[in-house]
């Protein structure tokens, strides 16, 4: 169902820190124009942790409105409280979203049995397609391949976003799940290798400002043309790394503002503005790639 370049969309804000609908609309149109395959609305990159419940829902609904059924919208509905995740999922059931991205519960560090029961409960509460999301370095818990295999038996748990950084897991998980289970990289720096090992695409931070590049890389890679895909990807390596010099989404919001996609790089505390030295380096690579001119290399 989902493959290729899926953007982990930033949530633009105005100078007062309120949601900027004008910039959000511009972002959505940018991804439609540049052939992004789907949008993640209000995931980690979308600052889900610092949006209140009404804002969370409103951003998703506005994203759907601006997408106008021209691009699938996947809603970030994860929580470290199972009941909260179920509540948000059910609230969005008739909204028109194409699926949900569910992060592993953060901070409370559940056991593998707890993780299994958490995702099982969410799955059984809805018919919406569910994508599991494993990002151990941010959550403090790791969804292991054996647990993923158990969860893959639920018909609406259709895939996994793997941001573990462990490429050896791709084949391990593939050997444990059915052939239709989707494996999506959550790490721009290793995404091409992930696809070459049998993955289906990437949920990308870099795509926020280099949508056509990431789309082309994924299209080539999924067609088996890794030589051409690597030629493009090599040009983005420095950019990938610079976008994670500080905690995501600090650098990507500044970069999106720099190239004119959003009006401000406002970000909510406890996240802070990008350091000047990192702005300088990002500006240099953005100019080199001509992303500020919206050109495709």
From Swiss-Prot:
SMART domains, sorted: DHDPS
SUPFAM superfamilies referenced in this protein's UniProt entry, alphabetically: Aldolase (SSF51569)
Sample GO molecular function, one term: 4-hydroxy-tetrahydrodipicolinate synthase activity
EC number: 4.3.3.7
Cell location: Cytoplasm
Enzyme class: lyase
GO term, biological process aspect, one: diaminopimelate biosynthetic process
Catalytic residue positions: 133, 161
Catalysed reaction equations from the record: L-aspartate 4-semialdehyde + pyruvate = (2S,4S)-4-hydroxy-2,3,4,5-tetrahydrodipicolinate + H2O + H(+)
Keyword tRNA processing attached: no
Positions with a binding annotation for pyruvate: 45, 203
Pathway(s) annotated for this protein in UniProt: Amino-acid biosynthesis; L-lysine biosynthesis via DAP pathway; (S)-tetrahydrodipicolinate from L-aspartate: step 3/4
Keywords for this protein: Amino-acid biosynthesis, Cytoplasm, Diaminopimelate biosynthesis, Lyase, Lysine biosynthesis, Schiff base
GO cellular component: cytosol
Site positions for Part of a proton relay during catalysis: 44, 107
InterPro entries in the cross-refs: Aldolase_TIM (IPR013785), DapA (IPR005263), DapA-like (IPR002220), Schiff_base-form_aldolases_AS (IPR020625), Schiff_base-form_aldolases_CS (IPR020624)
One Pfam family matching this protein: DHDPS
Major localization listed first in the record, in broad terms: cytoplasm
Secretion signal, residue range per the UniProt entry: none
Gene3D superfamilies, A to Z: Aldolase class I
PANTHER family, alphabetized: 4-HYDROXY-2-OXOGLUTARATE ALDOLASE, MITOCHONDRIAL, DIHYDRODIPICOLINATE SYNTHASE
Family named by the database record: Belongs to the DapA family.
Subunit structure: Homotetramer; dimer of dimers.
Role summary: Catalyzes the condensation of (S)-aspartate-beta-semialdehyde [(S)-ASA] and pyruvate to 4-hydroxy-tetrahydrodipicolinate (HTPA).
Name this protein carries in UniProt: 4-hydroxy-tetrahydrodipicolinate synthase
Species: Buchnera aphidicola subsp. Cinara cedri (strain Cc)
Native organism taxonomy: Bacteria, Pseudomonadati, Pseudomonadota, Gammaproteobacteria, Enterobacterales
Gene this chain is encoded by: dapA
């Amino acid at each position: 169902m989902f493959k290729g370049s899926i953007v982990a969309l930033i949530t633009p804000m105005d100078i007062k820190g309120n949601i900027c609908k004008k910039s959000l609309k511009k972002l959505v149109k940018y991804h439609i124009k540049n052939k992004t395959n789907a949008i993640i609305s209000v995931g980690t990159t979308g600052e889900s942790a610092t949006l209140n419940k009404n804002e969370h829902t409103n951003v998703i609904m506005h994203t759907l409105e601006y997408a106008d059924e021209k691009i699938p919208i996947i809603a970030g509905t994860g929580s470290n409280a199972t009941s909260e995740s179920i509540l948000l999922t059910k609230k969005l059931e008739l909204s028109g979203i194409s699926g949900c991205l569910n992060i592993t519960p953060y901070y409370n560090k559940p056991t593998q049995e707890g993780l299994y029961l958490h995702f099982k409960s969410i799955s059984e509460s809805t018919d919406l397609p569910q994508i599991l999301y494993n990002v151990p370095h941010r959550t403090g818990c790791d969804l292991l391949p054996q647990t993923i295999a158990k969860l893959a038996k639920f018909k609406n748990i259709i895939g996994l976003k793997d941001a573990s950084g462990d490429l050896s897991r791709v084949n391990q998980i593939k050997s444990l799940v059915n052939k239709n289970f989707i494996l999506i990289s959550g790490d721009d720096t290793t995404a091409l290798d992930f696809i070459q090992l049998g993955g289906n695409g990437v949920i990308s931070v870099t795509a926020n400002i280099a949508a056509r590049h990431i789309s082309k890389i994924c299209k080539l890679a999924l067609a088996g043309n890794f030589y051409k895909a690597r030629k493009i990807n090599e040009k983005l390596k420095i950019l990938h790394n610079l976008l994670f010099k500080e905690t995501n989404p600090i650098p990507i919001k500044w970069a999106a503002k720099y190239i004119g996609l959003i009006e401000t790089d406002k970000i909510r505390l406890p996240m802070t503005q990008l350091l000047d030295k990192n702005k300088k380096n990002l500006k240099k690579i953005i100019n080199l790639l001509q992303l500020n001119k919206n050109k495709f290399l």
